[in-house]
Design a protein with these regions (language model features):
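The conserved beta1-alpha1 loop
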Residues: 66-68, 143-144, 174
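Active-site nucleophile loop of the alpha/beta-hydrolase fold
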Residues: 168-179, 201-205, 223
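Flexible, membrane-associating and regulatory peripheral segments of lipid-active enzymes
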Residues: 1-95, 102-113, 122-135, 161-165, ...
Length: 336
């Protein structure tokens, strides 16, 4: 008994769970219609039933959204994302509800559960692909820890399919920082997890990834805290965070939702540059402009892209966002 206890303590210190996560607590939600209430919940092992739903349109792109730590379908982010896709109207929207597994201690519970759930979701998606879901019409999107889990899903699909299936696109919205940079018993999302991985950084170095981690990395307003319009933060620990502290981190999904709702209308224009400092000095490649968000081209040239946004909705400044404008009423980070 003493040896078992010691072994468990060692596992805890290493950030390892002593028991397998109850993966059946996670569900898939299929949204249809024009209100949040229009959805149906499926067990992961019954996911292929989604394809039989009368409102599932196999000719449309299917998006799977994975939320972050201590989130559930009841929180604002899910409602904003769902509303945006419903306004767009051109997508089958699935949401992975893993709220009961994304709770508890961040490192010892949520991260470890994500590491187990990612491969399970990969198996579910392979099953969907085998039953008719078109791979070239599938898009995986995740925020924070959900962004990191998206990478886990992509890697697992590639491995489980014996390198025959690679997701077309993963979009990571301010993917979680600890414990992925440096990797401590984990592997961070990377450009290798899908054919194209686009990343939106809004709280880099605090709750979000501190460095470029995709095929294309967007750095709106430097990609760091404070994002324009966000209040001064208290810099609390993950165990005692408030909405004030999460404002910059959450701005990533707000940007994403705005781009989705805009549909084909150009929104967040971004330009390639070596750094935020160079962007402010107009050292940019104006010959190549792309959009941040849903309409980021899947053929985008790899690299780092910068832009400015407004501090409130609409966040997009359109084409004006690629030209730095000093605003005394907005606090920008002083570092590059």
């Amino acid at each position: 008994m003493a040896n078992t206890s010691l072994k468990n303590k060692k596992r805890l210190w290493l950030g390892l769970k002593t028991a397998h996560a109850q993966l059946d607590l996670a569900k898939l939600m299929f949204f249809y219609g024009d209100s949040f209430e229009n959805h149906q919940i499926y067990e992961l092992d019954e996911a292929t039933e989604i394809l039989k739903h009368p409102r599932f349109d196999a000719t449309k792109e299917t998006t799977l959204y994975i939320h972050g730590y201590i989130e559930t379908p009841e929180v604002e982010s899910i409602h904003v994302i769902v509303d945006a896709y419903q306004k767009n109207g051109d997508h089958n929207l699935l949401v992975l509800d893993w709220g009961e597994l994304a709770d508890g201690n961040y490192l010892l519970d949520a991260v470890q559960n994500a590491k187990q759930l990612g491969p399970k979701v990969a198996t579910v998606l392979i099953g969907l692909f085998s039953n008719g879901l078109q791979r070239d019409l599938f898009h995986l999107v995740g925020h924070s820890l959900g962004g990191q889990m998206s990478g886990m899903v992509g890697r697992s699909i590639f491995k489980k399919s014996k390198e025959t299936i690679k997701l077309k696109r993963i979009s990571a919205l301010d993917p979680a920082f600890p414990p992925f940079y440096p990797a401590i018993g984990t592997t961070a999302i990377s450009k290798n997890d899908a054919v194209m991985v686009d990343v939106i950084h809004t709280d880099a170095g605090l709750y979000g990834a501190p460095r470029s981690t995709g095929t294309v990395d967007f750095w709106p307003n430097s990609g760091k805290t404070l994002q324009p319009g966000c209040p001064k933060r208290d810099y609390k620990l993950l165990t005692d965070i408030g909405l004030k502290d999460l404002c910059s981190h959450r701005r990533s999904w707000r940007f994403w939702a705005e781009s989705v709702a805009a549909k084909d209308t150009p929104t967040f224009h971004a330009v390639k540059s070596k750094s935020w400092s160079d962007f402010k000095k107009f050292r940019v490649d104006e010959s190549y402009i792309i959009q941040m968000g849903l309409n980021c081209p899947e053929t985008a040239r790899p690299g780092d892209y910068y832009l400015q946004t407004n501090g409130d909705q609409p966040y997009s400044k359109g084409i004006n966002g690629i030209t730095y404008e000093k605003n005394e009423n907005v606090v920008f980070p002083t570092n590059d």
